[in-house]
């Protein structure tokens, strides 16, 4: 978690932390969740009335339990996101080129070791992305 703070995070919640205990109920306007899984219910609890939950991944698990009351009684919006408008990627690259944000690479693997990369990825002990390097 120190590594995440070093690159600019103001507040860090661990993978196994209770998000409701860490943030408090109805304390957040928007949740961007790239993980999914068991933390889904807690993510909805921390959203304020009219809040938005955006999902763009499910590496923590694609199936979740939803109490519909936590959704409709707070007038929440659930948004799936897999594609960006054309200028978004160019803007992201610009931020990286200017050093305003930097990708966090946990580890690199030669492409022929993709099975090792997948195995290590599933252990969930890393911070950042894995990069596969194709042969020259």
Model-based region annotation:
Residues 1-3, 63-68:
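Short, glycine/polar-rich helix-capping loops at beta-to-alpha or helix-loop-helix junctions
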Residues 1-39:
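Adenosine-nucleotide cofactor-binding segment
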Residues 4, 31, 43, 78, ...:
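Terminal peptide-recognition signature
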Residues 13, 29-33, 56-57, 81, ...:
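Glycine- and other small-residue-rich loops at beta-strand/loop junctions that grip anionic moieties
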Residues 28, 40, 68, 89-93, ...:
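A general structural signal for well-ordered alpha-helical segments in protein cores
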Residues 45-47:
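Conserved helix-to-beta-strand junction in the class I
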Residues 49-54, 65-105:
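Rossmann-fold dehydrogenase core element
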Residues 86-136:
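C-terminal hydrophobic helical "lid"/dimerization subdomain
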């Amino acid at each position: 978690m120190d590594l995440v703070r070093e690159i600019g995070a103001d507040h860090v919640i661990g993978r196994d932390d209770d998000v409701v205990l860490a943030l408090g109920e109805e304390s957040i306007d928007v949740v961007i969740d790239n993980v999914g899984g068991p933390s889904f219910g807690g993510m909805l609890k921390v959203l304020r009335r009219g809040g938005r939950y955006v999902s763009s991944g499910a590496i923590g698990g694609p199936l979740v339990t939803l109490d519909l009351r936590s959704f409709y009684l707070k007038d929440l919006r659930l948004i799936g996101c897999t594609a960006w408008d054309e200028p978004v990627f160019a803007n992201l690259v610009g931020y990286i080129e200017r050093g305003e944000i930097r990708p966090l690479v946990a580890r690199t693997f030669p492409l022929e070791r993709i099975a090792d990369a997948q195995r290590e990825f599933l252990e969930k002990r890393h911070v950042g992305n894995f990069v596969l390097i194709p042969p020259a």
